[in-house]
């Protein structure tokens, strides 16, 4: 469960290391984001000479959350960290590589490019 002021690790090679959530997209009163939801964030930590700089406002899709999520078959999935992948306005990832596993919920939300780049889908 990601909300405003949550910090997330960036799981791609855009050069950003950490982002701060400033808005959860999808409705005026929407409070929380889970795996597969889109957020607006600002870059808090970035590598020097990268494509994104500290302070840039970016869109990202959440790929891992510490809060467990119940699946339709009754199982639960949770990860060790909160992580996101930076995306363009069309929904395509800005980076060319994804690090770490991603949730299967991304397939339901039609983020096929992220699914294909990810080393593991849980």
Swiss-Prot record:
Superkingdom of origin: Bacteria
A biological-process GO annotation: translation
Organism for this UniProt entry: Parafrankia sp. (strain EAN1pec)
Cited SUPFAM superfamilies: Ribosomal protein L14 (SSF50193)
HAMAP family assigned to the protein according to its UniProt record, in alphabetical order: Ribosomal_uL14
Protein name as annotated: Large ribosomal subunit protein uL14
Keyword terms: Ribonucleoprotein, Ribosomal protein, RNA-binding, rRNA-binding
GO molecular function: large ribosomal subunit rRNA binding; structural constituent of ribosome
Protein's job: Binds to 23S rRNA. Forms part of two intersubunit bridges in the 70S ribosome.
Family statement: Belongs to the universal ribosomal protein uL14 family.
């Amino acid at each position: 469960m990601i909300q405003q002021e949550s910090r997330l690790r960036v799981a791609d090679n855009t050069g950003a290391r950490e982002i701060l959530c400033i808005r959860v997209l999808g409705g005026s009163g929407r409070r929380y984001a889970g795996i597969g939801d889109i957020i607006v964030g600002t870059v808090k930590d970035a590598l020097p000479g990268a494509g994104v700089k500290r302070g840039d406002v970016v869109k990202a899709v959440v790929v891992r959350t510490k809060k467990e999520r119940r699946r339709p078959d009754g199982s639960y999935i949770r990860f060790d960290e909160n992580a996101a992948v930076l995306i363009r306005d069309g929904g395509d990832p800005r980076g060319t590589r994804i690090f770490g596993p991603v949730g299967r919920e991304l397939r339901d939300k039609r983020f096929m490019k992220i699914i294909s780049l990810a080393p593991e889908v849980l």
